[in-house]
């Protein structure tokens, strides 16, 4: 029987336990619709803010009530935590003048970072008057915002082709976007191939991977089906038989996310955006294991 030399064993332990250098994280939240959801949201923000994320983002609904909730959450985060808070802003349901007014209001209230998106098309609607690239240009006309946009490693469901989707991302970057945050994915190779294609297309901004820690596999599969995200067969097998075992699902989901971050960090990725679904537990545990901790 052979045994590892002590130094070799320690090196193996380190490679299994660590990411490749320091990583940065950011978190996405959505506006709550009930008082109970609001309490959950603020509990999550309070806990995750201790990890000193680069920024946090808040999604933006297609109706005025949800837009107002986004503004309220953004204001609360800034006052309560001092974190950089980035509201999502969509252009599908607003005029250019309305968008300029919203942008000026954000700028005048100290908001410098916006996640610029087209937004979901209403059923039966025709060709939109504005796209995300147009919104980026409009925001840059109003003020020198720091702008994040969306990217799709596995292609946007409405795109005519992967190349057309890539050219759309390039238009957003050429209009002034500072970075792209990807749709969630589970196939690490799809992200790495996409990053290479971005470089080849002359897209020179950071492509931040969006990480979705999965605790409810059925829900994640629905999200994936709607957004053209592939669920690898190995992942389906890992969640098999866990429909009634929520705690084990969380452990499995956390391990998958941690492995993804470790692999990507070894490929030079330093920034990761977590889709929290307004829950702190899994994202906090994942970050802790990866070395992102309070006071560090």
From Swiss-Prot:
FAD binds at residues 60, 62, 88, 118-120, 132, 152, 156, 159, 165, 168, 171-172. InterPro entries: FAD-linked_oxidoreductase-like (IPR029041), Mehydrof_redctse-like (IPR003171), MTHF_reductase_bac (IPR004620). It is an enzyme of class 1 (oxidoreductase). NADH binds at residues 59, 183. The active site is at 28 (proton donor/acceptor). Catalyzes the NADH-dependent reduction of 5,10-methylenetetrahydrofolate to 5-methyltetrahydrofolate. Is required to provide the methyl group necessary for methionine synthetase to convert homocysteine to methionine; the methyl group is given by 5-methyltetrahydrofolate. This is 5,10-methylenetetrahydrofolate reductase. The gene is metF.
């Amino acid at each position: 029987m052979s045994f590892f030399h002590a130094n070799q064993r320690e090196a193996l332990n380190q490679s299994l336990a660590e990411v490749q250098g320091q990583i940065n994280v950011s978190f996405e939240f959505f506006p709550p619709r009930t008082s109970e959801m609001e309490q959950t949201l603020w509990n999550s923000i309070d806990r995750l803010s201790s990890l000193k994320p680069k920024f946090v983002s808040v999604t933006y609904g297609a109706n005025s009530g949800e837009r107002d909730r986004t503004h309220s959450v953004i204001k609360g985060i800034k006052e309560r935590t001092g974190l950089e808070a980035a509201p999502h802003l969509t252009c599908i349901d607003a005029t250019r003048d309305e968008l300029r007014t919203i942008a000026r209001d954000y700028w005048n209230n100290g908001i410098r970072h916006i996640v610029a998106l087209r937004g979901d098309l209403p059923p039966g609607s025709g060709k939109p008057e504005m796209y995300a690239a147009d919104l980026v240009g409009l925001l840059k006309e109003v003020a020198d915002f720091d702008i994040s946009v969306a990217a799709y490693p596995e292609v946007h469901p409405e795109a005519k082709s992967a190349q057309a989707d890539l050219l759309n991302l390039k238009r957003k970057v050429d209009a002034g976007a500072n970075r792209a945050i990807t749709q969630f994915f589970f196939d690490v190779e799809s992200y790495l191939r996409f990053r290479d294609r971005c470089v080849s297309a002359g897209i020179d901004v950071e492509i931040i991977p969006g990480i979705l820690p999965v605790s409810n596999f059925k829900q994640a599969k629905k999200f994936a089906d709607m957004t053209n995200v592939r669920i690898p067969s190995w992942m389906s097998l890992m969640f098999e038989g866990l429909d009634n075992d929520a705690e084990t699902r969380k452990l499995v989901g956390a391990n998958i996310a941690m492995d993804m971050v470790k692999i990507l960090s070894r490929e030079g990725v330093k920034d990761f955006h977590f889709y929290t679904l307004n829950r702190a537990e899994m994202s906090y545990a994942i970050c802790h294991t990866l070395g992102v901790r309070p006071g560090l």
